[in-house]
């Protein structure tokens, strides 16, 4: 028997993944198109009027469903995207009131002066809070701007037209664990796009397929990764709202790259986590066990003593050396800013969305 017929959906721009970076890219693209059209209508802009269909697919039940609470967010990118974000129900309210960077020893530690860490001075602008709530709020702003957001929709295969990528096939629904079809079976959709933006995370299945197919890593240093584990702890006593702690040293040895963090999200919730580079050579190394040791340190205990773990999670992270990885301890804001600028280039620098000379059926990727 042949394949069940699949529906095809034509869009101009497809974002794969509902993380902060992709949401920011989609949010940035819509006003850029409006600005472009205004310029064309007034005779002061080049090109043609654009009427873009923009879509974003997210595999989770809701955007943010796979995010673990407890993150530091720099609003600098959001101020560029939505200058009035505070009037739109922005879900984070806890500003960083105190930021410490500490080198921990077995029982104590020393505070590293901010004069040695110039980038740390900006942390007072940051917010602490739930990444899940932030993503969900960003998705609401994106939908309000006219972007189609499809939850519970997983990209399983990249579509190619000869040597060019032309979209993504989504996964079938209503499939049994053994592969059989349930009564509610529904074949996936072929979403065809002129521009596709992959924001799947550090080791996305589709992104890796694209990288291997077009040999994007050839001649480049291998990508390094880290593993992060995090717990959200509820404390009965007054916690330390606004306190952001980053640590190096204990419990990690000199041969393991990484560190810990402790964020006071509100009066009764503290996020504690540990991030370790995945290049360790100790077969007994266990990041979760290292997190438990960090939690027992006297300095961390003052924030979480007597608390109860109410949520936990783990995730791989891309690493890029000191200059790319250490300063931005507020990565969600940086990711938003970078993807927003990529979206801007997509409109302004000759991608097929704006190129009158190219075949309308042309495809491109970012």
PLM regions and their residue ranges:
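Beta1/beta-strand and adjacent pyrophosphate-binding region of the FAD-binding site
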Residues: 4-21, 55
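FAD/FMN-dependent oxidoreductases across multiple families
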Residues: 256, 282-353, 357
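N-terminal FAD cofactor-binding segment of flavoenzymes
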Residues: 28-33, 39, 43-108
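A short, basic/flexible loop-to-alpha-helix module at the beginning of a structural domain
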Residues: 1-10, 38, 46, 179-188, ...
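Conserved Rossmann-like nucleotide-cofactor binding loop
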Residues: 21, 62, 203
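Predominantly flavin-linked oxidoreductase catalytic cores and closely associated redox partners
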Residues: 31, 48-50, 132, 136-137, ...
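Active-site-proximal substrate-binding core of FAD-dependent oxidoreductases
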Residues: 43-51, 341-347, 359-366
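Glycine-rich Rossmann-fold phosphate-binding loop(s) that bind the pyrophosphate
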Residues: 18-20, 59, 131
